[in-house]
């Protein structure tokens, strides 16, 4: 009986969340996300600021999106009338979850998580008949020349959207480190 109580206490001490990818549910330990050892690091903060800048505030007309682009889930009991502080905490939680999906990419998990926050992880990782993106395939092979592939995520209905292209360029500039990855130095990443 004491073991059950201790186990329950341990479960509640470690913040966890879950997300569904296709039909699989992933349990994520938010303290072990690999965006960075300290998720409130400078780069994580830059990502949050960048997302806020380009997402803007989502009001009732943006339903089912609230705050800074959070998509409401069926079980969530709030709407667009949330505080900025609450929206900030949701953004950070969502970004950590996205980063966790890309944990195998090490320090690139932040830029990939930031992109997935906007376009969805399926566009990067593939799902069903949709293949992995060229961006992911290049990074898996160790190819750091991903600028064009990253910026290419700026289309809507087949057309380049200048504001989204500007966003991608800023995200890349702020968050992608092409040098000294895995003890290798890369002179050019474009």
Model-predicted segments: where are they?
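Early exported N-terminus immediately downstream of N-terminal targeting peptides
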Residues: 63-66, 70
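Structural motif
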Residues: 102-108
